[in-house]
């Protein structure tokens, strides 16, 4: 039978199956786990899932007896006996984690809901498995050692990593599965420069992605569709269970050696998408081509509006300006609901007539956006007071 020392907050298991018997108060309090079972489970997946489902948020350390045939612990983290797989990181570990040299696989769910902020991955790691870092909301930085052998990153690997704003995968990566960054905080991303690279769709589902970059040599080897399609969202994006304020409706798409493009996040399939793809391919066929107004291919009004805003900021085209002027009333309200910064992006274009400034001022006052209020008041035509009017 398991034992629990409330003073040291240490839980001791004599058999793995005792995990099922633990009351909630122990799961809530325990900081140390000692396992004296010498056996290896039939599947490492069951082992990791069993520990993960305990939901021991304060657990900082796991100690497995030396006689166990399948597992060992280094710095409180569980690895396979031969060290080739990282299986489980306790949720109570915080700060920086360095993966053991010689590890080849960061396993499924191994860091799910962890509280680490940084991780260094050695050059020996070849694969990051499904949902490996899922819901690690404090994870900000992922470092890869020089000479990395990482070749495969599986689906939802960084799902829900809200603090992860950018990441640079090593050029050794050959395969990136779908929705790797779904619901994460990723804002900028550069594709690995590898001629063998295969990327599945919807890479940035429900992400606040702002900019994607493609190396020129890689584009020349593989064409544009390999990198453009994963940036787009499928038609279901509007039904995802996420904060709509975080999702971006348009992004800057860059290929080294070419001007950037402003693209909507969702383009309806069919003839509309075919025209969109044709315009993109035509643009990247000639280095000095004029950037097309791709906002018109947006799947709905929001995508068209945001892509037009990006297009105008990049190139000040007449078409994108017309679109902004036509939609500014609804856009100002929507941007204000998101944040003062988002509204400022629209306001500071300085292309508005007095009635629009008045409308924006009213919205800014309702939201108590003091900096914007001051800015707009400076832009409004100065009114003469009655006392200054000569008779």
Task: Indicate where each model-derived feature is located.
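Structural signature of tandem-repeat unit edges
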Residues: 1-105, 113-127, 137-152, 162-175, ...
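Ankyrin repeat A-helix N-terminal signature
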Residues: 335-338, 363-369
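Conserved hydrophobic site in ankyrin repeats
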Residues: 345-346, 376
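Boundary/linker segments of alpha-helical solenoid repeat arrays
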Residues: 354-361, 384-390
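Charge-dense, extended regions
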Residues: 368-391
């Amino acid at each position: 039978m398991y034992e629990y020392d409330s003073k040291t907050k240490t839980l001791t298991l004599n058999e793995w199956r005792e995990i099922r018997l633990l009351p909630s108060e122990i799961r809530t309090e325990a900081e140390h786990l000692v396992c004296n079972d010498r056996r290896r489970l039939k599947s490492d997946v069951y082992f990791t899932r069993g520990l993960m489902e305990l939901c021991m948020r304060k657990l900082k350390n796991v100690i497995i007896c030396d006689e166990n045939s399948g597992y060992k612990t280094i710095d409180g983290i569980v690895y396979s006996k031969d060290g080739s797989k990282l299986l489980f990181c306790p949720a109570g570990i915080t700060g920086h984690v360095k993966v053991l040299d010689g590890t080849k696989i960061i396993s499924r769910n191994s860091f799910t809901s962890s509280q680490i902020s940084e991780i260094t991955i050695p050059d020996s790691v070849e694969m990051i498995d499904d949902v490996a870092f899922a819901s690690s909301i404090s994870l900000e930085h992922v470092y890869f050692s020089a000479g990395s052998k990482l070749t495969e990153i599986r689906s939802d690997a960084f799902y829900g990593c809200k603090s992860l704003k950018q990441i640079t995968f090593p050029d050794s990566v050959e395969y990136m599965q779908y929705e790797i960054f779904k619901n994460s905080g990723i804002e900028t991303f550069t594709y690995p420069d590898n001629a063998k690279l295969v990327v599945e769709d919807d890479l940035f589902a429900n992400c606040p992605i702002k900019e994607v970059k493609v190396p020129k040599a890689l584009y020349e080897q593989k064409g544009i569709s390999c990198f453009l399609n994963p940036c787009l969202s499928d038609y279901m994006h509007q039904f995802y269970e996420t904060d709509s304020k975080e999702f971006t409706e348009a992004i800057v798409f860059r290929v080294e050696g070419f001007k950037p493009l402003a693209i909507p996040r969702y383009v309806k399939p069919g003839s509309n998408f075919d025209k969109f793809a044709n315009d993109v391919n035509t643009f990247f066929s000639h280095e000095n081509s004029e950037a097309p107004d791709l906002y018109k291919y947006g799947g709905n009004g929001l995508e068209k509006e945001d892509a037009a805003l990006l297009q105008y900021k990049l190139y000040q085209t007449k078409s994108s300006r017309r679109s902004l002027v036509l939609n500014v009333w609804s856009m100002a309200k929507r941007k204000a609901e998101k944040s003062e910064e988002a509204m400022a992006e629209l306001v500071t274009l300085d292309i508005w007539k007095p009635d629009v400034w008045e409308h924006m001022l009213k919205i800014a006052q309702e939201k108590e956006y003091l900096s914007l209020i001051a800015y707009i008041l400076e832009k409004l035509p100065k009114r003469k007071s009655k006392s200054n009017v000569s008779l």
